[in-house]
Amino acid sequence: MSESLHLTRNGPILEITLDRPKANAIDAKTSFAMGEAFLNFRDDPELRVAIITGGGEKFFSAGWDLKAAAEGEAPDADFGPGGFAGLTEIFDLDKPVIAAVNGYAFGGGFELALAADFIVCAENASFALPEAKLGIVPDSGGVLRLPKLLPPAIVNEMVMTGRRMSAEEALRWGVVNRVVSQSELMDSARELAQQLVNSAPLAIAALKEIYRATSEMPVEEGYRYIRSGVLKHYPSVLHSEDALEGPQAFAEKRDPVWKGR
C-alpha cells in the first residue's frame, strides 16, 4: 500500500485517509493504491461501509497532481482500477462510501467526493471544478454527476468558470448531507457509518443496484424493470434470512442481527 494512503479498520467500517502534503493531490501511483483499497473494500465480506477523507485540515484533495502532469503524466494516463482516485469508475460497488471532506475539494478531489454515496463536510470545506481554466475538462465524473445534482445554470458556471461553492451553499443545494465543525467531522462521518451498519447489508446493496439501473427511467418503466428478475440483489432480498430477521427483531423489541443472506 502507498505511503500516501492510510487504512484503518474499525470493525465493519474502513477509513481511508489520503495524506500527500501539501494538497493531497493524486498522481497515477496514488490512484492505483486507492483503487486497490476500494476494490478490497468491495470484496471483503466483513467490511460494510468506507469513509474517505484527507489528511490535515486544509485540503480534502486538490485533485490531479499538476506536478506529475508537468513531469509528463497525461490527463488520460492509466489511473488504475476504479478510475481516477480509485472510486470514480467503480460501478458495481454495492456498499456505501462516505466522503468526509475536511477542506478544499477541487477538481478530481470534488469528483472523488461526488462518487461517494454521502458527503459530510467541515464548515471550511469548499468545492470547485477548475479544469477548464487549466485547459482540460472534469471527465472523472464531475461533468457527468454534477448535472444530476444541480440546475444547469449553476453547473455551467462551476464547470466553465471554476467558481467555488461553499459548504453551506452545497448543503442548500443538497450536494452534501451534513456540514459540521472541523473538530466534529470524523465523529459525524462515523456516526453516519454506524447508522448504515445498522441497516441490512442486502437491502443497501439492492437499493444501490436499483438506483444505478433505474435512475434515468420513468417510474412505471422502473417498476417493470426491478420486477423483471434481471437484478442480482433485489430478488435475493425478498427471500432472504434478513427479510425475516427484521420484522422478527422488531416484534421482539431487540436489535436485528444481520447475516447478509
Swiss-Prot record:
One Pfam family cited in the UniProt record for this chain: ECH_1
Enzyme class: lyase
Catalytic activity: (R)-carnitinyl-CoA = crotonobetainyl-CoA + H2O
Any single biological process term in GO: fatty acid beta-oxidation
Pathway listed: Amine and polyamine metabolism; carnitine metabolism
InterPro entries: Carnitinyl_CoA_dehydratase (IPR022852), ClpP/crotonase-like_dom_sf (IPR029045), Enoyl-CoA_hyd/isom_CS (IPR018376), Enoyl-CoA_hydra/iso (IPR001753), Enoyl-CoA_hydra_C (IPR014748)
Membrane-crossing residue ranges in chain numbering: none
GO molecular function: hydro-lyase activity; L-carnitine CoA-transferase activity
Keywords: Lyase
SUPFAM superfamilies associated with the record: ClpP/crotonase
CDD domains found in the cross-reference section: crotonase-like
Active site residues of this protein: E111 (nucleophile), E131 (proton acceptor)
Highest taxon in the source lineage: Bacteria
EC assignment: 4.2.1.149
Function, as annotated: Catalyzes the reversible dehydration of L-carnitinyl-CoA to crotonobetainyl-CoA.
Protein family according to the UniProt entry: Belongs to the enoyl-CoA hydratase/isomerase family.
NCBIfam families according to UniProt: PRK03580.1
Protein name as catalogued: Carnitinyl-CoA dehydratase
The organism of origin for this protein: Salmonella paratyphi B (strain ATCC BAA-1250 / SPB7)
